[in-house]
Amino acid sequence: MTEFSASLAPQVEAFLRYLSIERQLSPLTVTSYRRQLSALMEIGEQMGLAHWQTLDAAQVRSLVSRSKRAGLHASSLALRLSALRSFLNWLVSQGVLPANPAKGVSTPRSGRHLPKNIDVDEVNKLLSIDLNDPLAVRDRAMLEVMYGAGLRLSELVGMNCKHVDLASGDVWVMGKGSKERKVPLGKTAVTWLQHWLALRELFEPQDDAIFLANTGKRISARNVQKRFAEWGVKQGVSSHIHPHKLRHSFATHMLESSGDLRAVQELLGHANLTTTQIYTHLDFQHLATVYDAAHPRAKRGKS
């Protein structure tokens, strides 16, 4: 341990114990804090920072800029600065610092990541699979349910038979934060779910899971990802197929057709409308593409 880390580390360790014991944060979260603060201590040593008590706003900005030069992206920088702010707030509460020097420091904004989707024709191409065995029927049902209801992968694999009402076409799923919600499946998804359920007993089910592996146990998320990717290749779909892409496609196509952002929010199970609003950017991209292709005075680069 260097002279600098010997003076910086004890308070970091005390903060981590506080997070673990008093805040009762998960070991994974505490490990994340440790990783970020250890990296900051290393950079601080390079800057000649000997004590947290001497840290000022200029040095905080230097910590951020050096982290950026080390290759951290904006989202990772924001995470690192957030960990530092929390630590410094704790130092303020302990009387070590009079104020938090990171309070007014911001990180570079990250570009908004737009989820990729596939168009309706590509979806239809993907779903027109050759039903030559029970597993193919199962996969078709999973694809139809994923696209028909816009489910998360965890929600799909977590579906149980008791959660589905085929008569009404509804299913109860367990979303993020263990929040249940009821979503409509749509007629096509219900039809293919019925086809699969008629074959499900062939796999000698070991629990109430709707979708089973060939062992009779609940299918794993990894298996679903693998099967979807394989079907994308077999069907000649132009982009890599993964479950989240079908969820994004569901959201985009619903918004393009209805324009009802609140309804899409409810269907996706988003706690905040802000999360759903990213699809308005996708919808605008769609409109802009149509405009550029159709409007007589929208020819770019021409006068």
Swiss-Prot record:
One of its GO terms (cellular component) is Holliday junction resolvase complex. Its main location: cytoplasm. The active site is at 152, 176, 244, 247, 270, 279 (o-(3'-phospho-dna)-tyrosine intermediate). Residues 113-292 form the Tyr recombinase domain. InterPro entries: CB, DNA_brk_join_enz, Integrase-like_cat_sf, Integrase_catalytic, Integrase_recombinase_N, Integrase_SAM-like_N, Recomb_XerC, Tyrosine_recombinase_XerC/XerD. Keywords: Cell cycle, Cell division, Chromosome partition, Cytoplasm, DNA integration, DNA recombination, DNA-binding. Belongs to the 'phage' integrase family. XerC subfamily. This is Tyrosine recombinase XerC.
